[in-house]
Amino acid sequence: TKPRLGAVGRSAARAFAQDYRKLCERLDCPPVSFYADSYRQAASSAASQSKLLLIYLHSPLHQDAEDFCRGLTSAQFQGFCRQRFVLWGADVRSADGHALSDSLGATRFPFLAIVICDEAGEKVVASVHGAPSDGDALVATLDGALTQQRGVLQALRRKQRARQEARRLRTEQDRDYQEGLERDRLREAQRQAE
């Protein structure tokens, strides 16, 4: 499924990131770094880094919210995510967070969605409803979801490598063309000077 997420704005993401940091201070645990800009910017960042987007929908009224947030601070979770994901979150009480929750079909919380982002758009490849709060269990759950989507992810990486190679070739061709124009200009100037 392809979520319609363009309207989820910067203010919802920044408010969530700020509230999350405050919660972590209160819980006396180091916060994980959430991308504090619009969904669109987070998706663009994930695509440019050849990473996946991991969306966390936070429901502070849910009984497991604090334990889950504590699990996000585990060294295992942070190390796992640093290599694979751009993390982005929203509070489901905000209008944007609620709209995103509806768009993604979140039925239980905590909720996570793994999204592939490229120039063709975004595609949810896995979601976790009622995610575990323990860092190790959370990593195992996400790793299992990634394993199930291995073929899709490998195809994405091949496409990204092909695009990068095409971009590199285009840049090289543009540079060669500009150098050729400069040589022609210098020859013409030299010919006219003679």
What are these language model-derived features?
Residues 39-45, 64-148:
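Thioredoxin-like thiol-disulfide oxidoreductase module
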Residues 18-22, 67, 76, 99, ...:
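Exposed alpha-helical structural elements
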Residues 147-194:
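Charge-rich, low-complexity alpha-helical coiled-coil segments
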Residues 56-57, 89, 114, 183:
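Hydrophobic side chains in beta-strands
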Residues 1-49, 144-160, 167:
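N-terminal leader/targeting and pre-domain segments
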